[in-house]
UniProtKB/Swiss-Prot annotation:
The keyword Zinc does not apply. The keyword Acetylation does not apply. Belongs to the KAE1 / TsaD family. This is tRNA N6-adenosine threonylcarbamoyltransferase. It is found in: Cytoplasm. Substrate binds at L138, V139, S140, G141, G142, D171, G184, D188, N277. Its main location: cytoplasm. It catalyses: L-threonylcarbamoyladenylate + adenosine(37) in tRNA = N(6)-L-threonylcarbamoyladenosine(37) in tRNA + AMP + H(+). Disulfide bonds: none annotated.
Length: 343
């Protein structure tokens, strides 16, 4: 390795993916090991925290060794250890934090605390350079946020969901339709074949703010399906999927466009698990044609879900800015972005 290179060992365990990665200079993936737990949670229709924690404990050591082996590096090649410490499930977070602290302590390496959502944003570094000021649309199972970044490693939430996250709504709607967890991809594929015939609500779309709400849409969808079931009416699943997805995409895109009109930025970053949705990606491509000076940077499809490579990218940025943690670092399940903004 070139001595000018920064090699970071990164950990991600905030929910139901155990992931360890080795990342060089914040933009090159040397390895990215992901042990998924989807099969274990499918029968419950969602993530069970206790089950997730146990799986992390079982897999973390194997993931560490696999990541080092695939990257062909040893501990002495590392410059730092980065770890997600929030937000997320507390038991799950603790596994990754404990492992990262142990390695940092044993090998006398700097420990870098990383906000999980910052990781999603910086996954875009694997596509290209992030230019500031920037706006990020973060859409996942647990969060839906518009984040303004005036400069590198500075974050300001300008809009967020008042209730359910968009990804959570996708999974609950999928369960009502009899789909397996997680159901976002299946809904997205089905939505390509249907029509928007149900006209589901677009909550808060016209309000003069950048916030979101998806609980009303979720309830309207569930009520529509249940009512049809009670009267023996058969609904077209493709039309249901299209109508639901269009409602979500309409709200996400309209709020993002509104934010772009208020904040002069160089880039719009689309990130998070729902960023893999083709309907949303296509809509933002279309909307950005009206903003000639704004570049759309979309997280790579394979890095939209939870993974440690994105934590390595965010960790590299934090490392450059002198962000460090000591051995008292603990999991913060309700961590927000404000801690990263200089007041």
């Amino acid at each position: 390795m070139d001595k000018k290179d920064n090699i970071i060992l990164a950990f991600e365990s905030s929910c139901d993916e155990t992931s360890v990665a080795v990342v060089k200079n914040g933009n090159e993936i040397l390895s990215n090991i992901v042990a998924t737990q989807v099969a274990s949670h499918q029968r419950f229709g969602g993530v069970v925290p206790e089950v997730a924690s146990r799986h992390h404990i079982e897999q973390i050591t194997y993931c560490i060794q696999d990541a080092l082996d695939e990257a062909n590096v040893d501990y002495e090649d590392l410059d730092a250890v980065a770890v997600t410490y929030g937000p997320g499930l507390v038991g799950a977070l603790l596994v990754g934090v404990a492992a990262a602290k142990a390695i940092a302590f044993a090998h006398n390496l700097p420990l870098i605390p990383v906000n999980h959502m910052a990781g999603h944003i910086y996954a875009a570094r694997f596509i290209g350079e992030i230019k500031f000021p920037a706006l990020a649309l973060l859409v996942s199972g647990g969060h839906t946020e518009l984040v303004y970044m005036p400069e590198e490693n500075k974050f300001q939430i300008i809009g967020e969901t008042r209730d359910d996250a968009a990804g959570e709504a996708f999974d609950k709607v999928g369960r009502v339709m009899g789909m397996k967890y997680p159901s976002g991809k299946e809904i997205d594929e089905l939505a390509k074949t249907g029509k928007d015939t149900f006209n589901f609500p677009r909550a808060m779309e016209k309000e003069d703010n950048f916030d979101f709400s998806f609980s009303g849409l979720k309830s309207a969808f569930i009520n529509t399906v249940h009512h049809a079931s009670q009267i023996g009416e058969k609904l077209d699943k493709a039309d249901l999927a299209t109508s639901f997805e269009q409602s979500v995409v309409d709200v996400l895109s309209s709020k993002t466009v509104k934010a772009l009109g208020h904040f002069k930025v160089k880039q719009l970053i689309l990130a998070g698990g729902v960023a893999a949705n083709q309907g949303l990606r296509t809509r933002l491509d279309k909307e950005l044609t009206a903003f000639k000076d704004v570049e759309l940077l979309k997280a790579p499809l394979k890095l939209c879900g939870d993974n440690a490579a994105m934590i390595g990218a965010a960790g590299y940025v934090a490392f450059k800015h002198g962000v460090r943690a000591d051995m008292t670092l603990n999991a913060e399940p309700s961590l927000e972005f404000e801690w990263m903004v200089e007041k």
